[in-house]
Amino acid sequence: IPIPTSLTLSVSSLSVYTNVEQIHVYVTTLGAGNCTITPSLPNGLVFDSVSCSISGIATETLPQTTFVVSSYDVFGASASFTLTVNMCSNPIIEIERVYKGQSSKEGYKLINLDTEETILSVEPNSNQQDNTISVQRICSTASRYEVETTSSGDYWYKYSYLNVYVLHGAQREQILR
């Protein structure tokens, strides 16, 4: 088995919005661990030095910045990625999906009706777990959206549902259930 001498990350560049998008950047090199990162991450993002991963939702803006991850377990090899965190100046749409029974058969899409583009898609049989809640956020750019529910069965389970909220700062207004 060859010993790795370089480090590879799951992404090379990310651009996200504050308080909106969950990020997960990780080392894909087998055997990598005992890592460091420079410079410091913005608030809301957490670095796990054991798994060499970055996760969270950034809560402050950041101009395009290059971060370097180094692994002592791979002879100090390093890799870099760039991160830009922008402020979402539009309302934030939050989709809260409550899964109860038969969740693997259920899916939904969020469609921007201005462009007919699918903004968010969760297909049936894509690892949904019963008795869980999933939350997705987007920085809204459209004047109208459509939520389309799908199922690989005949219907959604009667206690499964979807809530849509608009976030205004710290306030959360429900607009659909």
Which residues fall in each region the model found?
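Solvent-exposed loop segments of extracellular immunoglobulin-like
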Residues: G31-I37, L41
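Short, surface-exposed beta-strand/strand-loop-strand elements in extracellular ectodomains
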Residues: K105-L113, D154-G169
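C-terminal edge beta-strand
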Residues: I1, F75-M87
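Short glycine/proline-centered coil/turn motifs in the loop regions
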Residues: T29-G33, T61, K100-Q102
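Strand-loop-strand motifs at the edges of beta-sheets in extracellular beta-sandwich domains
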Residues: N43-A58
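Solvent-exposed, low-complexity, repeat-rich "mucin-like" stalks and linkers
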Residues: P4-A32, L83
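Exposed beta-strand face motif in extracellular beta-rich ectodomains
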Residues: P63-F67, S143-Y145
